[in-house]
Each structure stands twice: as C-alpha cells, then as structure tokens.
Amino acid sequence: MRNVILTMIMAGFAMGANAGEMSVAAGIEQAMWGDHRSEANQARNRYRHPVGTLTFFGLEPGMTVIEIWPGGGWYTEVLAPVLNEEGQLIVATWDPSVEGQPNYRYEQPKRMAAKFADAPSVYGRVQTAYYSPPESASLGEAGSADLVLTFRNTHGWFNGGQADDIYAEFARVLKPGGVLGVVQHRAHPGSDPAETAPNGYVSQEAVIALAERAGLVFEAASEVNGNPRDTRDYEEGVWTLPPSLTMGERDREKYTAIGESDRMTLRFRKPAQ
C-alpha cells in the first residue's frame, strides 16, 4: 500500500515538478513511514500531510532548518532523515535553565534527548537550541537559517503576549531569502485572537499581519492541511479533536470523524535585501 501511495505522489509531482522536487518528496515519504516512527505517529500522516506541507515550504536536503518547539517530535522524525546527510536540523526546545516554567517544559527536553539517543543513525546530527523567551530568546546567529518551521504553536504566543517578539526572532535568524513556514489551527476570518487563541485557533489574516510586522513577506498559502469539517466551537477548544480527544469517550466517534483541526499553511520569505 505504501508503494502505491508513493507512486501516486510521484505521479502528481511529475505534472510540472522537476527531478529535485520529486527526490525531496520521495525522501519525505520514506521518512514518514520509517521504522523509527511509532504506528500512532505514522497513522497521523493522513492528517498532517508532511509531503505536501514540507514541499510547499521548499524543504531541500542541504538546508539548515530550525524547528520551533517540536512537542513530541512528530515532525522531527520526518525532518531528521531528510536532512541527515547534507543539511542541518536544529530543534529549538524549551530552555531547562530558565526558572518558573511549567513542569512539562523541563520534561520535554529530556524526552527529546532520550529519543535522539535511542536512534543515533536518525538523530545523531540533530542539534538542540534552547529557546524560552524572553529569558532565553536567541535561536542562533543572525542570518544562519534557510528555513524556520513552526507547527501549531502560534496561538500560544498570542496567549502569552509574545507573538511579535518571537516572529521578529524568526526574521532575525533567517538568511536573506530564507523562508518561514507556519502551520496553525485556523479561526474564522475576522475573529479576534484574544478571544480565539485560548481555544487554540488564530485567524489567517492575524498570522499574516504578525509575520509582516516582523518584516517578512507573505508569499503563498496552501490548503494542504485544511479541514472544512472543523466547526471550531468545541467545549475544550481544538484539543477536543484528535489527537488529544480531551473529552475522553464522550462523543469520541463524532470528534474522530471530524479529524484533526482545520489548519492554515503559510509561507513567508525574508527579503533578499
């Protein structure tokens, strides 16, 4: 079945794509079904669309890529093999030296370190940057990254009043001509982030305006992660839906049928000059 899927993807990319793009897509496909991934994470490929998402962002094997706050490392598992030979993946996780953070921010770096140690052939070249703004607010040298990626984090930065500072740091660390790729749970157009971000959603226009304030240029949007079944009106916010399913068994079939959230997928570029 996986071979059939790969053949279909390659056929789609052949319609106007060059050999390099096809090779990148094949590498992503191989990584997302890799033996280093759990069955649960592989099952989410159908919702998170890593081939379409990462090729839209312009991922290339020789890039320096910074992944912001990777959580359990779902996308890290895909990015690390693609970048392993020619590129550099930098995982920006919470800084355990910063006091007063929630407990999970101290546990997550430990889990990631253990994950990397368990599969050195996959993660042996991955670097870690500690990032807990405002106390620990640098992602690296200015102009050092080809691609910065943030998956489903931006609502939290609106909630914490840090969104502008964090996006400004993305712009600073990107090379001229570099790309910021954003995937974020999408609120209804015109909605106020102050009202929707606590439920995990932010409007697309609010994210575009945020990046533009940081000096980045909005280049394109993709509907690869769109989901029209997401009504965004749940008792426990976006976490009502898979994979969290915070309502437990209550209406589980209903929320499972909706699937993961409706997400914007946006590409921004740092001006070359």
Map each language-model feature to its residues:
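C-terminal lobe and adjacent flexible extensions of AdoMet/dcAdoMet transferase-like proteins
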Residues: E253-Q273
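A short acidic, Gly/Pro-enriched loop at the edge of an enzyme's catalytic core
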Residues: A137-V148
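A short, conserved alpha-helix within the catalytic core of class I
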Residues: P134, G156-E169
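Conserved class I S-adenosyl-L-methionine
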Residues: G62-G71
